[in-house]
Amino acid sequence: MKLSKYGRRQWLAATVILVAGLLVSGVLMYFVFPAGCFFAAASLLVWGAFVTFFRDPHRVIGQDKTELVAPADGIVKDMELIPNASCEEAVLRELFDGYDILRIGITQSLFDVHIDRMPCPVTVKVKESREKTEEKEDSSFLLLGGTGEIEDTQFPVALKQISGGKLCRIVCKAEVGDRLKKGARYGMIRYGSRMELYLPAKSPVSIIANTGERVHAGKTVLAVFSREKQV
């Protein structure tokens, strides 16, 4: 099982703790064999659960250039049409340049793969983050925005990684100026929370995913490009 480089420090630390736990188990087995066996089994179980969270399975990215794939594993929780003038994020209002915005929200559980991927080829233009503070009890987030391109048609696209819990941490290795391929890994949300994908509401891109649908990053098709639709 391949483990993500985004969690290398965490799963290496877990492995060191496992080795220490097994050494303790060996000592316990010498004195109280059942207790030592139980401690060893518990150590292996905890280690297995921990490193499984950082798994990075191989994904075959679809070669159909007209398809946009899911940016994260999870459940499509909601879809919302946001009038540009009503959008709370100034960076999104500017990125979408007057166009209304369609937001697709994907929620993640601890059991999902947490590697985030690009839904289509994207040139990154903006990277903005906000940390949770005592004054603001809402979630921390990192927003990545840029220009998506499908069959020589360009359109604004944005991805927002959201961490709700105290243990959740956002990792984003993409930087302004990067040109990322469809399905390219660019980060993760450690211990999970929510991913939001933003697309122009009126565009050549048609949404085919449904709320309640389980999706897989880089694999499940969320939307398709059609030249019959006009921006």
Regions found by a protein language model. Give the residues of each.
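Contiguous, well-folded functional domains in the mature portion of proteins
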Residues: 1-231
